[in-house]
């Protein structure tokens, strides 16, 4: 949107910020202005960071930045949503990411997909942190942005689930997909292995 309609994009961003102020966190796949917790990642972050870095800043950058940091941390306090939605809006995957550095596949469904999306979103936060002169957070989120490396099994050249003991998920079939019950979200290792847009080398 920053290319085709930056003014409309600023309206989107102001709506995202308002949603955070009213509900306690950025939305994930909002439906009829309600939290659903559907899908993964915290992709309000790249929308905001993209606009900010391109100079489209008709929004409260400090409030947006604070909300970006909030989106990346595991903290269920202050979120106004139905109890049924909360575990999806604030999945334990964020806790594992921050506490042990990776998301165990035997503790969280779609662990690889969540980790790869979180890594990209965290990279975006690191860029925003630098722009906001928050160098401590910049270093922290740069480190989180490299978390995708945990999942790359060099022996087979695929992103693959790691269990809570740090061992690869077996058996492994890069073409296998069991909707909502495996290490990937609506895809396979063949598709998800390539999702590292912030570090294509």
Predicted regions and their residues:
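Catalytic cores of carbohydrate-active enzymes
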Residues: 27, 126, 131-201
């Amino acid at each position: 949107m920053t290319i085709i309609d930056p003014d409309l994009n600023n309206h989107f961003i102001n709506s995202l910020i308002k949603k955070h102020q009213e509900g306690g966190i950025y939305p994930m796949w909002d439906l009829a202005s309600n939290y659903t917790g559907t899908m993964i990642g915290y992709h309000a972050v790249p929308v905001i960071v993209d606009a900010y870095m391109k100079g489209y800043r008709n929004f409260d950058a400090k409030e947006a930045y604070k909300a970006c940091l909030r989106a990346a941390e595991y903290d269920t306090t202050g979120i106004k949503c139905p109890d049924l939605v909360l575990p999806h809006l604030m999945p334990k995957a964020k806790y594992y990411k921050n506490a042990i550095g990776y998301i165990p596949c035997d503790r969280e469904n779609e662990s690889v997909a969540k980790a790869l999306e979180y890594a990209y979103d965290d990279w975006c936060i690191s860029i925003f942190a630098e722009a906001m002169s928050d160098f401590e957070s910049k270093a922290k989120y740069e480190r989180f942005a490299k978390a995708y490396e945990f999942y790359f099994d060099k022996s087979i050249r695929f992103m693959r689930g790691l269990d809570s003991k740090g061992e690869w998920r077996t058996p492994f079939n890069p073409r296998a997909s069991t909707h909502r019950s495996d290490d990937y979200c609506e895809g396979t290792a063949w598709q998800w292995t390539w999702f590292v847009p912030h570090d294509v080398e």
